Amino acid sequence: MKLSIVQKADNTPTEQYLLEHPKENAKSWSSDPGAHGWHRYVGRFPAQLVRAICNYFDLSENDLLLDPFCGSGTTLVEARLLGIPAVGIEISPLSAMISRVKSGFNVDTSDIEEYITRLEEFYYEKYEVFLDGKDISEYSYEEIIARDGNSICAFSNYDKWFTKEALLGVSVVVEYIIKIRNNRYISELMATALFAKMRSIGNVDVDVVRAEYRKTPRENVNVLKLVVSHLKKMVKSIKEMKFSHKSTIKEA
């Protein structure tokens, strides 16, 4: 199935087609192009449906689009790409945060890239200071939770949900997110990236809607690598959205 309803107009590729096919003559397309793929969200309707409705009603920068149940922000993202002012309402704090992050990005990614570098430096320092030359296996879960700078509260069965290295890694990333919370967008962007990779970090099956323990714990979990890799994909997609929708996208 092709995602773009219209691929070309007067032999010129449409903006949606460019976003779904960032490379010319690509053999595959993205079902969650741009910011839509930043965080998995069960029950989210296709972005192409929103795009089609906006086009049908000929919405423009002179209109105001309201999504009273915005979820993860699919409608808000499409409105942002099309230059349509939009407002979303969402009761779930997590969903509201994801929608803000997906629709509120700055098209200039230099600030995000700088914070990614700072995250890497912070992570290596905090991780190594805690280990103090020892192996992670020499520490207990309780010692990781009691780590100076940790803000994750003790919870039941954390030894089943996370390996020690994964719990320590998440703890350090969360510490950094809190440290930079004065920059609300960047801190929420990084939190979204962390949450998006949580199924790959924790001892859970990734292919089920309800979280369930894995039969075998994940080994050699590198939280920083997973989070930074996702952040860089987010940066790449911002650049793609800026290019594919340069005629309509506006600053947040």
Predicted segments with their positions:
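Conserved class I S-adenosyl-L-methionine
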Residues: 61-71
